[in-house]
Regions:
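Conserved S-adenosyl-L-methionine
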Residues: 1-5
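A short SAM/SAH-binding and catalytic strip from SAM-dependent methyltransferases
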Residues: 61-75
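A short acidic, amphipathic alpha-helical/loop segment
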Residues: 76-83
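S-adenosyl-L-methionine
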Residues: 20-56
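Conserved beta-strand signature within the Rossmann-like core of class I S-adenosyl-L-methionine
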Residues: 86-99
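Conserved SAM/SAH-binding beta-strand->alpha-helix loop
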Residues: 10-13
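Carboxylate/His-rich catalytic cores and anion/metal-binding grooves
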Residues: 17
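Rossmann-like AdoMet/SAM-dependent catalytic core
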Residues: 52-56, 104-139
Length: 139
């Protein structure tokens, strides 16, 4: 894939990701990367908002989150998910229950709020009570 990548993580992991990606010759920047073929290693919500608002609507995009969102506090995941409704495709992996949170109910309500998507929720056979949520923009 040639295009823009956005990695959102804790500051220390963002720095580590930038270091590693640069060491293998990938154009990565700690923070917002203006290059449309680069990697932005972001750890601040404000920077994420900025990068997402500058996302080229004509280019294809995919959002991938493997267990990260389902393990975040509700206030943070709600803030995060409210910003990402303009991707072409989604892949979110999550466990049914995390702490006191019923993730199946949470993600069901979230996907219902995005009307222009076709959704498929699939249990991961080798990981009982874990799911892949696939979404595709239908417009």
């Amino acid at each position: 894939f040639k295009g823009q990548y956005i990695i959102f993580d804790l500051p220390v992991f963002s720095a580590l990701q930038e270091f590693y990606l640069k060491s293998i010759g990938i154009n990565a920047k700690y923070g917002a990367n203006e290059d449309t073929n680069g990697v932005s290693c972001i750890f601040k919500i404000e920077a994420l908002k900025e990068v997402l608002s500058n996302k080229k609507s004509k280019k294809k995009s995919i959002f991938i989150a493997t267990w990260s969102i389902s393990e975040a506090p509700i206030y943070l995941r709600s803030l995060f998910l409210s910003m990402i409704g303009n991707f072409d495709v989604f892949l979110i992996a999550y466990q049914r229950q995390f702490g006191e949170t019923d993730n199946s109910t949470y993600f069901s309500a979230w996907k219902d709020s995005l009307k222009n998507y076709q959704w498929y929720n699939h249990e991961i056979r080798h990981l009982p009570n874990n799911y892949y949520l696939f979404g595709k923009n239908t417009q």
